[in-house]
Amino acid sequence: MLVTIWDQLTPPTKLDLEAGTRYRKRDLLAAMLVCSANDAASVLAGSGRASYGDFIARMNKRAKRLGAGNSCFLNPHGLDLPGQYSTARDSAIIAYHAYHDPLIRHLSVMESLPFQYADGRTSILHNTNMLLLHRPPYFNGLKSGFTILGGKCLVATSKYDGVETIIVMLDSTPQDVFQDAEKLLQWRLKRLKENM
């Protein structure tokens, strides 16, 4: 995938990709899932304004087809933009489908990722999901994020005895989001064990 000047200007870039360089889709997806690389999300969306707009339209259409009808996406990375919105329920629906993609699930639990730049440099990217540091029992993914309007957000997944759980936390704080998520996952695990 070719990086354009449009991608290079995506704030905050995270990777500082240079216009004119090329990367594999898988490497960009990995950077996006591991360290929230917004510039990687922009490149994956196709960058040029026509294809970028087409990507956003397809993204909204797909979300609605999955049942996430209370969302309107205006960019591929989720940064605040007037008119862009979603709900915890829609986030859970989308996460459910992402969770069942083996590549996304694998990449979302990588604690770190060696990322090779087009010029040969390598940088170690660290996962923004702090649940990975002390993995609650049966925790197995997915993604954290932050925006000014949305606060600290997290979608966390777990699986116990064949039962999958997805929790979505929106508008939390960096101090609370991971502790609260861990408490919710522990509570869910306890309830599952009680009902067996």
Language-model features and meaning:
Residues M1-R89, A98-Y99:
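Active-site-adjacent loops and short helices of periplasmic peptidoglycan-processing enzymes
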